[in-house]
Curated annotation (Swiss-Prot):
Residues 41-51 have a biased composition (Low complexity). Heterodimer of FNTA and FNTB (farnesyltransferase). Heterodimer of FNTA and PGGT1B (geranylgeranyltransferase). Residues 19-32 have a biased composition (Pro residues). It catalyses: L-cysteinyl-[protein] + (2E,6E)-farnesyl diphosphate = S-(2E,6E)-farnesyl-L-cysteinyl-[protein] + diphosphate; geranylgeranyl diphosphate + L-cysteinyl-[protein] = S-geranylgeranyl-L-cysteinyl-[protein] + diphosphate. This is Protein farnesyltransferase/geranylgeranyltransferase type-1 subunit alpha. PANTHER family: PROTEIN FARNESYLTRANSFERASE ALPHA SUBUNIT/RAB GERANYLGERANYL TRANSFERASE ALPHA SUBUNIT (PTHR11129), PROTEIN FARNESYLTRANSFERASE_GERANYLGERANYLTRANSFERASE TYPE-1 SUBUNIT ALPHA (PTHR11129:SF1). It comes from Rattus norvegicus. PROSITE patterns: PFTA. Keywords: Acetylation, Magnesium, Prenyltransferase, Repeat, Transferase.
Length: 377
């Protein structure tokens, strides 16, 4: 029976037993040379972990299985139930089975204790993607009134090791909600994005923080900086759309013109950048591609020196929009669109030639005068 956050007081099971007495200390080692002392200190630092409160790593040679610990003798472990006839059963390590058998036991008892809290840490070290462990850890954080700033330090280390794990980012989000303090978030996320600027978990968290705490100031400047570093980063173009949509919007003609010209300048830098073309289409499509003043002429001027499949496809979209809006020179516009579809099929986007020929046939079928449609169509 899974525990839920904020349900009840401490469950039966009592407080953990007394820890085992440590063995007598070994005799002092022989004197070390300065270099040896430095190496030993570095090794000690490497073995330490965030929130080091007596936690013993699963990789430690002195690690003791839970089933062999006196303070856990009152708990009957709960094995994983894979059903009567498991297929392709996972072969877990002895440590993994031991930790999760005891985790299932404390979860079943809804035991809100310090030992249960430490157990979640072992379980997370073995599988940080287990959302049930994270959920129960949050239950214990509240029940035991743990220091949430210490927990933030802990989750920072986990995210740095596993930056593309849904559960660790969700845990951080809950902590920020509880603390009502986003002061570390934008800088922390920027550090993660410096390692991988397309980490959508980090972007999702950034969007939530900005929207939840109204941190819109300077975000567009941050986006500009990242686009200068990598104009092809679709995640950053998406962030640009997110920021403007939630602040000024695109209804203001000055904002829209600024964004159109900004995007065209980025396209001039890298003509074959699909991300920029998608952004341009996204901000104009609902307003009518053919209705934006002078856009068609600007793209036609770009075509000789900055031609790409995306530019030609965009021209097809503009011509189609003109046909849909009953332009005066319908036959001429249709012929231009059909010619571009054939250029895409034969030269610029040959891998999708059948798609572009289908688009051409569709345009011809829809917008040709009935007497002009070939019998085969």
């Amino acid at each position: 029976m899974a525990a839920t956050e904020g349900v009840g007081e401490s469950a039966p099971g009592g407080e953990p037993g007394q820890p085992e007495q440590p063995p007598p200390p070994p005799p002092p080692p022989p004197a070390q040379q300065p270099q040896e002392e430095e190496m030993a200190a570095e090794a000690g630092e490497a073995a330490a972990s965030p929130m080091d409160d007596g936690f013993l790593s699963l990789d430690s040679p002195t690690y003791v299985l839970y089933r062999d610990r006196a303070e856990w003798a009152d708990i009957d472990p709960v094995p994983q139930n894979d059903g009567p006839s498991p297929v392709v059963q996972i072969i877990y390590s002895e440590k993994f089975r031991d930790v999760y058998d005891y985790f299932r036991a404390v979860l079943q008892r809804d035991e809100r204790s310090e030992r249960a809290f430490k157990l979640t840490r072992d379980a997370i070290e073995l599988n940080a993607a287990n959302y049930t462990v994270w959920h129960f850890r949050r239950v214990l954080l509240r029940s035991l009134q743990k220091d949430l700033q210490e927990e933030m330090n802990y989750i920072i280390a986990i995210i740095e090791e596993q930056p593309k794990n849904y559960q660790v980012w969700h845990h951080r989000r809950v902590l920020v909600e509880w603390l009502k303090d986003p002061s570390q978030e934008l800088e922390f996320i920027a550090d993660i994005l410096n390692q991988d600027a397309k980490n959508y978990h980090a972007w999702q968290h950034r969007q939530w923080v900005i929207q939840e705490f109204r941190l819109w100031d300077n975000e567009l400047q941050y986006v500009d900086q990242l686009l200068k570093e990598d104009v092809r980063n679709n995640s950053v173009w998406n962030q640009r759309h997110f920021v403007i949509s939630n602040t000024t919007g695109y209804s203001d003609r000055a904002v829209l013109e600024r964004e159109v010209q900004y995007t065209l300048e980025m396209i001039k830098l890298v003509p074959h950048n699909e991300s920029a073309w998608n952004y341009l289409k996204g901000i104009l499509q609902d307003r009518g591609l053919s209705r934006y003043p002078n856009l068609l002429n600007q793209l036609l001027d770009l075509q000789p020196s900055h031609s790409s499949p995306y530019l030609i496809a965009f021209l097809v979209d503009i011509y189609e929009d003109m046909l849909e809006n009953q332009c005066d020179n319908k036959e001429d516009i249709l012929n231009k669109a059909l010619e571009l579809c054939e250029i895409l099929a034969k030269e610029k986007d040959t891998i999708r030639k059948e798609y572009w020929r289908y688009i051409g046939r569709s345009l011809q079928s829809k917008h040709s005068r009935e007497s002009d449609i070939p019998a085969s169509v």
